[in-house]
Amino acid sequence: IFVSSTEGAYRERDWQVRFAGQGYNWLGDPGNPAPPPWLEDLQAAGIPAQWSPDILSRLWRKLAINCAINPLTVLHQCRNGGLLGHLDQVQALCVELERLLRQCGQPHAAQDLEQDVQRVLLATATNYASMYQDVRAGRRTEVQYLLGYACQAARRHGLHLPHLEHLLQCLVDNLRVRGLPCD
């Protein structure tokens, strides 16, 4: 079972996570499009959840949105809404991420990506991205799980995505200067 969630939480310190806001959860099994009977138990318990027969598309879309937002907030040292002043960079990344999604067999996830990223920037304008918060707190980031994964997928498919590769290198350099792990 795969899950994509918009629930808000952050790590205060090791082994302590604080719930920061209710979101929504999409669950799915790429091998079985039918929802399991226990899904109703989650909903009855007050956990907002929905079965998504196309969960992989949702997860790829979330990866792309996070790749377009999180690293730039670190490099520009800003809240999500601060990226509205850097839409040229956001747009260039979205063009490349759309190419990647299509090449990875996820055309639905690629549709209107830039508009969705801008919607997220507006809806979360006062929030700090998780990667920004991790850097600020001196914690390990998810750079390799986001940008690293996307760049590896691009190489596997023979795609040259210069903006994405440059962003990864700039972020890794930024983390090294701060003495933070880059792997």
Question: In which residue ranges do the predicted regions lie?
Answer:
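Rossmann-fold dinucleotide-binding core
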Residues: 1-58
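Active-site-proximal catalytic alpha-helix in oxidoreductases
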Residues: 56-98, 125-126
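Short, charge-rich amphipathic segments
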Residues: 20-37, 50, 79-88, 102-107, ...
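Solvent-exposed, flexible loop/coil residues
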Residues: 10, 14, 21, 59, ...
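Helix-loop-beta segment of a Rossmann-like dinucleotide-binding subdomain
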Residues: 14-25, 74-82, 127-136
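Long, contiguous hydrophobic alpha-helical segments, chiefly transmembrane helices and signal peptides
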Residues: 5, 25, 64-74, 131, ...
